Each structure stands twice: as C-alpha cells, then as structure tokens.
Amino acid sequence: LTRTGTTYLHELLGLHPETRSHYAWEQQHPVPTTDDESASAQQFDRERRYKEGRPRFEKGQRIAGDYFQRIHKICYDASEECTVPCSVEAPWNASTLTFMVCSSEKLFDYSLGQTYQLYSRFLQILTWQAPDLASTWMLKCPFHLPYLIELHATFPDSPLIWTHRHPCECIP
C-alpha cells in the first residue's frame, strides 16, 4: 500500500480530548484477569497488565527493528491501529499477509462480519474498563478498505475518513 499519511492523521485526531484509540498494550492484554469488579481492583489489574506487557512489547520492537519503526512507529502507550485485534481471523495477520500479497484477489473472498463483531466486543471491554476516558472510538487500519460494507454494518454510526495520494505523485 502506498503511504497516505493515515498514521499521522490518526495521531493528530488522537490528540482531540473526545476521541479514544486503543493502545498497543491494551491489544496485548485487553481482558481483566480479576473477578473483583470494584473500581480499585480493576485499576490495579489494569496497571499490572500494563506493566507486565512492556517486556513482550519491547522484545517485539527489537525483532521488528528500526526500519519498521521508521515506516510505522508503534508506541506502547499511544494510539495504535486495529490490525492486531482484528487479525484473529482476518486475512492480514502476520502469518498470512505475505502470501496474500502474492494473490490479492483472495483478500476479497473473506467475510469479516464475525471479525468486526469480535472487534466491537473488544472495544466494549476496553470502554467498560476505562469509562472515564473518551467514548468516541477512532479506528484505523488500511486493511479495512475491501471490507467497508461489513465495517459499516458493525459500526453504522461511524464516519469514515479516506486519505489518498495519487500513485504517480508518491511512487518515484
């Protein structure tokens, strides 16, 4: 995919106090591990998951290397795109994406209705855990493009922003 500035736009829109994106650390450990529903227990659990997930994230960063970070910076506690939580059964997870690039028509054979339903539950879990944060979710993933009908069916009230650069202007 050509670089269209979606990461920069995502970061910019994420500065607005009424929007919220999920963070990389929340993608690793979205579900509380305690049965205690009190606010203090939930906060303690959230902080513990945050702290315990950092070494795994940093290991992934070392494996990905500086080149990937220059293309798409990922921070542990900053807005992140929805590639990871949607990749449970979507065709763009790391193990299948390289094969799909070779035969991109297969991308259109998938139905992501169930994936988006699971993603909606993921967002509900995060909203429940941090009700004091902004409630307007901002989603970002370039792989949504072939599945806009299913995305809209799951999130019917969500506006879509499409960034575009003409290929002749961005590819030498």
Where are these regions (language model features)?
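Short, well-ordered loop/turn elements at secondary-structure boundaries
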Residues: 3-4, 130-135, 154-158
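PAPS-dependent sulfation machinery
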Residues: 26-137
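Short His-Asn-centered micro-motif
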Residues: 1, 138-142
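Conserved phosphate-donor/acceptor-positioning beta-strand/loop module used by diverse small-molecule
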Residues: 140-141, 150-172
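A generic secondary-structure signal for well-formed alpha-helical elements
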Residues: 16-23, 130
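Glycine-rich phosphate-binding P-loop
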Residues: 1-19
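Short alpha-helical
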Residues: 4, 146, 169
